[in-house]
From Swiss-Prot:
<dbReference type="InterPro" id="IPR050381">
    <property type="entry name" value="SLX1_endonuclease"/>
</dbReference>
<protein>
    <recommendedName>
        <fullName>Structure-specific endonuclease subunit SLX1</fullName>
        <ecNumber>3.1.-.-</ecNumber>
    </recommendedName>
</protein>
<keyword id="KW-0539">Nucleus</keyword>
<feature type="region of interest" description="Disordered">
    <location>
        <begin position="386"/>
        <end position="444"/>
    </location>
</feature>
<keyword id="KW-0862">Zinc</keyword>
<dbReference type="GO" id="GO:0008270">
    <property type="term" value="F:zinc ion binding"/>
</dbReference>
<dbReference type="InterPro" id="IPR048749">
    <property type="entry name" value="SLX1_C"/>
</dbReference>
<dbReference type="GO" id="GO:0008821">
    <property type="term" value="F:crossover junction DNA endonuclease activity"/>
</dbReference>
<keyword id="KW-0378">Hydrolase</keyword>
<dbReference type="InterPro" id="IPR013083">
    <property type="entry name" value="Znf_RING/FYVE/PHD"/>
</dbReference>
<comment type="function">
    <text>Catalytic subunit of the SLX1-SLX4 structure-specific endonuclease that resolves DNA secondary structures generated during DNA repair and recombination. Has endonuclease activity towards branched DNA substrates, introducing single-strand cuts in duplex DNA close to junctions with ss-DNA.</text>
</comment>
<keyword id="KW-0255">Endonuclease</keyword>
<feature type="domain" description="GIY-YIG">
    <location>
        <begin position="23"/>
        <end position="105"/>
    </location>
</feature>
<keyword id="KW-0863">Zinc-finger</keyword>
<feature type="zinc finger region" description="SLX1-type">
    <location>
        <begin position="240"/>
        <end position="295"/>
    </location>
</feature>
<dbReference type="GO" id="GO:0017108">
    <property type="term" value="F:5'-flap endonuclease activity"/>
</dbReference>
<dbReference type="InterPro" id="IPR027520">
    <property type="entry name" value="Slx1"/>
</dbReference>
Amino acid sequence: MAPSIQSLSMIHDSQECIKPIPAFYCCYLLRSCVRHASLYIGSTPDPARRLAQHNGDRNGAAKRTLRENLRPWEMVAIVSGFTSRVAALQFEWAWQNTKVSRHADLDGNVIQELGVRICPRTGKGVKGTAKPRTSLTNILANLHLLLRSPYFSKWPVEVRFFSADVHRVWQVWLQRVDGLLNDGIRVVTDFALDGISEVERKELLAGAGRVGTLDVGYNSIKEYVEKSQFLLEDGERINCGVCKQRLILQHDIIAVCSHSSCHCAAHLSCLSSHFLKDKDSDSELIPREGTCPACYGKLEWLTMMKEISLRLRGQEEVNRLFRRRRQAGTPKGQGLKSVRGRGRGHSEDESDALQVSTGLDIVDLTPCSDDPWTIDCAIGELGGIAHRPGGESSGNDSDATITPEMETPPQRRRRNQNTRTQRLGLQKSATINLSDWDDAEVIE
C-alpha cells in the first residue's frame, strides 16, 4: 500500500533539515609506513582528502597522526556503504571499542584471550604478550566480529583492501574463525602499492594511491537521476509495476528502475514487498537487492534509495551534479563567449549544437582587459579567428568574420589620457562602447 498523503507531506516539509543519503562514507584503517605496528581507525566521506590531512599535506590531521616520525601513513582497508554519517560513526566507535560494544559477542573473540597475532609477511601465528588492541590481527578480528553481529550483518557494506599483506592476515583469520560473513557483505581487493620500489611507493602515497581513484560523488548514478527526472516529469500516466495502480506523482514515494532501457516505476512499499517475496526471507525487513518486475534486471536497494533521497531531499546536490564545469582559466560567472555561438530563439545547448552543425564562428567583441581590444588579445582568445587588417585569416573557415578597425599605440595613449580624469574614482567598466565599432568593416 502506498504511503499516506499526510506522511508524505511531513517528508517534504522536512527536506530542509534532512539530507540525502551521502554519495560515499567509509570507515578506514591507517597504518604507518615507518612503523607498521602503529594503526589508526577513523571515518570520512573523502578518503583521499583525509589521507592527505593525516600525512600533513592539508590541515586537519588527527592528534594521533601528527607525529612526523610515523609519517607517511597509508590507508590499507576501508569499510564503505553506510547510508548516513551517523551510521559510519556508530560503526567506527564499535570498531575502535569492540570490547565494550553491545554489538560484539565477546565469547567469540578468542584472540583477546589468547593474545595470538598473525604475521603479515608469512601468514603464520605468533604468540606473545603484545597488546591485543594495537595488533593488526586483533583489529581485523574485531572487524570480522562486528560484520557477523546481528546488527551490522544486515547493512549493505563493502570491505576493500588496498594492501596484500593486510588481506593475507584477513584470509588467515577467516580460516581460524568458525563464523562466516553474510553473503551480502562484499570483500574486494585493490592492490596497487605492492610489488614496487619504496621510492615509487612513497610517490603513490603522496597522491593517495588507489584511494584517490574512489568515486566519492554521485557521478555513478548521474544518468539514473536524469532518467528518473525525465520519466516522472513527463506528465504521462504511469502505473505501478507491481500493483498496477496509478502512481500519484505529487504524493507517492516512487522507485524507478536503474537500468537505462527500462521505464518501470513502482510504489516503494510495493517494490520492497516484491523484493522480499522473491528473497523468501521472513527475518529481513529491508531488502538488499531484487529483480525489476518489468525487465527482470538486478536492482540494488541502496542505489535506488540514493536516487530517491536525491529527488526528495537533495535539490542542491542535483543542481551541483548537473552544473556545467567552468573551463580552466575562465573568470567565474563568465563563459567562454568567444567560441560559443548564441542564436536568437535557441537555448545554450541548442546554440552550441547549431554552431557545430553549420560551422559558423560568431565572434564576441568582449574586451579581455581594461584597454581596448588589441591584436594579441584577439588572436589569443579566438584562436586565430580575428585577423590583422589587410592580412589573411589564420584559419581555413570560409565564413565571414568581423574585424574591428585597430588604432595605433600613440592614438590609444592619447585617448586614455583624455578619459583618465573622467574615470577617476569610478569602477572601470568591462564593456565596450558600441560607437567604437561604427567604422568596423565586414571582410567577405
